[in-house]
């Protein structure tokens, strides 16, 4: 299986990489949060742009991205607008969503974008090609904050992302039971062993699913999300605790 290298970070080998999400409403908060995050132990900075209030002003959005890039130049920057239908803070049209991601790609400030699988097949394929033409990696994602589908469906979604040439397919699901967590882990393992030719990221959310955020190296998930301050999804634990557990499992 091939790995994905962003800056000096190799994703898909060794212990799962830690992603943290920065969620700030304006430029001032982006700046202060960035300074606080700079001291934390993580691998990839995700900027959750759906929390940013001044979305209609692309210049303002890119000014914020520039602050993040300049504050943490060594960290890979993942640009993510999480749609309202997949748990995000704001609802925008598909056209606006694609335009925002293209603006991020054009800016030269971001290393990766998050592109939701169910945005529309043609738009997704075109945006992946556009990102790759500008040397930007694509994390293709799907989130369900209500349920966990059958393993076959989880695998089908991850394989579809791979067929659309996502650099890293990602899925996050809400368990209704511990069995749902096992379903997610079994699907991850089957995908990783039988179909994946690139790194994947999977997680089961909430307290019930915490084990999935810790055991990625065992089952085949290449990265996990931790919290510096406020968690961006239910079930995230602090980056310091997360790094400790990931290191213990890696060295065992």
From Swiss-Prot:
Coiled coil: none annotated. Its EC number is 4.2.1.10. InterPro entries: 3-dehydroquinate_DH_AS (IPR018508), Aldolase_TIM (IPR013785), DHquinase_I (IPR001381), Type-I_3-dehydroquinase (IPR050146). It is an enzyme of class 4 (lyase). It catalyses: 3-dehydroquinate = 3-dehydroshikimate + H2O. This is 3-dehydroquinate dehydratase. Belongs to the type-I 3-dehydroquinase family. Gene3D superfamilies: Aldolase class I. NCBIfam families: aroD. Pathway: Metabolic intermediate biosynthesis; chorismate biosynthesis; chorismate from D-erythrose 4-phosphate and phosphoenolpyruvate: step 3/7. GO terms for biological process: 3,4-dihydroxybenzoate biosynthetic process; amino acid biosynthetic process; aromatic amino acid family biosynthetic process; chorismate biosynthetic process. It comes from Escherichia coli (strain 55989 / EAEC). Keywords: Amino-acid biosynthesis, Aromatic amino acid biosynthesis, Lyase, Schiff base. Involved in the third step of the chorismate pathway, which leads to the biosynthesis of aromatic amino acids. Catalyzes the cis-dehydration of 3-dehydroquinate (DHQ) and introduces the first double bond of the aromatic ring to yield 3-dehydroshikimate. GO terms for molecular function: 3-dehydroquinate dehydratase activity.
């Amino acid at each position: 299986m091939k790995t994905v290298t962003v800056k000096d970070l190799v994703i898909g080998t060794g212990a799962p990489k830690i992603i943290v999400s920065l969620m700030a409403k304006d430029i001032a908060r982006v700046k202060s949060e960035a300074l606080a995050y700079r001291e934390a132990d993580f691998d990839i900075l995700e900027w959750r742009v759906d929390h940013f209030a001044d979305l209609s002003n692309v210049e303002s959005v890119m000014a914020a991205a520039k602050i993040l890039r300049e504050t943490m130049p060594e960290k890979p920057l993942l640009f993510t607008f999480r749609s309202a239908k997949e748990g995000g803070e704001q609802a925008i049209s598909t056209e606006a969503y694609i335009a925002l991601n293209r603006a991020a790609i054009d800016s030269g400030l971001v290393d990766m974008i998050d592109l939701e699988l169910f945005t529309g097949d043609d738009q997704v394929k075109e945006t992946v090609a556009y990102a790759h033409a500008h040397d930007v990696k694509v994390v293709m994602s799907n989130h369900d904050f209500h349920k966990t589908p059958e393993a076959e469906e989880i695998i089908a979604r991850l394989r579809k992302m791979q067929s659309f040439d996502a650099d890293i397919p990602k899925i996050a699901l809400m368990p209704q039971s511990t069995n749902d967590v096992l379903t997610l882990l079994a699907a991850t393992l089957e995908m990783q062993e039988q179909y994946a030719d690139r790194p994947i990221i999977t997680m089961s959310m909430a307290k019930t699913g915490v084990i999935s955020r810790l055991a990625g190296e065992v089952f085949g998930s290449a990265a996990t999300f931790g919290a510096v301050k406020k968690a961006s999804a239910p079930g995230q634990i602090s980056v310091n605790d997360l790094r400790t557990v990931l290191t213990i499992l890696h060295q065992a």
